[in-house]
Amino acid sequence: MAPAASADHDMDVDMIHDEEDDQGERLINEEYKTWKKNSPFLTALTWPTLTVQWFPDVKEPEGKNYKIHRLLLGTHTSDESPNYLQIADVQIPKVVAPNPDDYDEERGEIGGYGKSGDVAAIKCDIVQRIEHPGEVNKARYQPQNPDILATLCVDGKILIFDRTKHPLDPTSTGKVNAQIELVGHEAEGFGLNWNPHEEGCLASGSEDTTMRLWDLKTLKADSRILNPSRTYRHHTQIVNDVQYHPISKNFIGSVSDDQTLQIVDIRHSETNKAAVVAKRGHLDAINALAFNPNSEVLVATASADKTIGIWDLRNVKEKVHTLEGHNDAVTSLAWHPTEAGILGSASYDRRIIFWDLSRVGEEQLPDDQDDGPPELLFMHGGHTNHLADFSWNPNEPWLVASAAEDNLLQIWKVAESIVGKDDGDLPIDELDR
């Protein structure tokens, strides 16, 4: 009789797990329905994209009530379908006077999150496709010339495309015509960053545990193949992300599965040891880093341990602060382009969180504590699967594009009533003291 009892117990456990899975799916679907009502724009892509970035330019067609922004996207298709590097035009309505008809009783405001009388005018169209070998792990434009695009491939190569030398729609010959191939990595990677201080230079990180630097200006006239100008072997495990310091032109940061944040000084010839090494800040792999563009010493790190670390580079023996609010690995980070203390993070928990570091340490009422720490400003829960990437729009404050493994590209904006500053907010330059 004992085996039968054991079988019954196993069936009960399976039923409980099935019920939990069903409840989880129902919760995800309900959240999605809510956000679908409130998001300015949701579009189902034919294939998911692992990468998204707003271009820096914006056009204002004469006589139109919208502006045209552009997005850089990729594809992640099945093996049978070709992959593309893609550019999309996004029509965003111009700011219009508040319409009393848009008053929302529940929020007590006109319009609000993603609400506008011109929402229907938002439109997203793919305007150029460039054939790509396999999925696009990451794509980024060169800041000095946004027509020059770099992509990370599944075989470890980095491809450089000049989009002006490619048709808007390829003939699907299966032939990839990149202008330059950067060869050196021995495995795929997701770390890619252009040098904001010097045109034609970029850094990359890979599963081969190396960080490599490249200088397109050294390419020989009769060649399409470029080798790295320098290879760093200061990490012991996968290098997940790399970034040039936006202020100090000689520093490059990298993070790794070895749970360290490391900063190299390119003025030094040493390639096996970093100038700055931050250890013991996380309990699992570090997936991303982001230097604060308004503070020379502040940097954030995102980890698989579900937390975000805030560091002062003058003393990396311990973190300045830890941001806690995600329920799964944190995979992406980006500071707001104009608000000095605002940090965005994306996670496998399907959420994007905006953090306001000026509110660190603020006192909370007991009821408010249930909503998270005081610095948790806003949480976007509209995706139904893991977040792949997100990007702040540099021209429209608080406008964000986000992409997830659910094939959805979302373009959304937070209501001003949510992100308004308080008089008692801490200045960003006081956080790093």
UniProtKB/Swiss-Prot annotation:
WD repeat ranges, renumbered to this chain: 131-171, 184-224, 234-274, 281-321, 325-365, 382-422
Location in the cell: Cytoplasm; Nucleus
Source organism, top-level taxon: Eukaryota
Protein keywords: Chromatin regulator, Cytoplasm, Nucleus, Repeat, WD repeat
CDD domains, per database record: WD40
Annotated segments matching region Interaction with the histone H4 N-terminus: 367-371
GO process annotations (BP): chromatin organization
InterPro entries associated with the record: G-protein_beta_WD-40_rep, Histone-bd_RBBP4-like_N, WD40/YVTN_repeat-like_dom_sf, WD40_repeat_CS, WD40_repeat_dom_sf, WD40_rpt, WD_repeat_RBAP46/RBAP48/MSI1
Pfam families tied to this protein: CAF1C_H4-bd, WD40
Gene Ontology CC: cytoplasm; nucleus
PROSITE patterns the UniProt entry points to: WD_REPEATS_1, WD_REPEATS_2, WD_REPEATS_REGION
Positions marked as site (Important for interaction with HAT1): 298
Keyword Nucleus annotated: yes
Family from the record: Belongs to the WD repeat RBAP46/RBAP48/MSI1 family.
Subunit comment: Component of the HAT-B complex composed of at least HAT1 and HAT2. The HAT-B complex binds to histone H4 tail.
Functional description taken from the UniProt entry: Regulatory subunit of the histone acetylase B (HAT-B) complex. The complex acetylates 'Lys-12' of histone H4 which is required for telomeric silencing.
Protein name (Swiss-Prot/TrEMBL): Histone acetyltransferase type B subunit 2
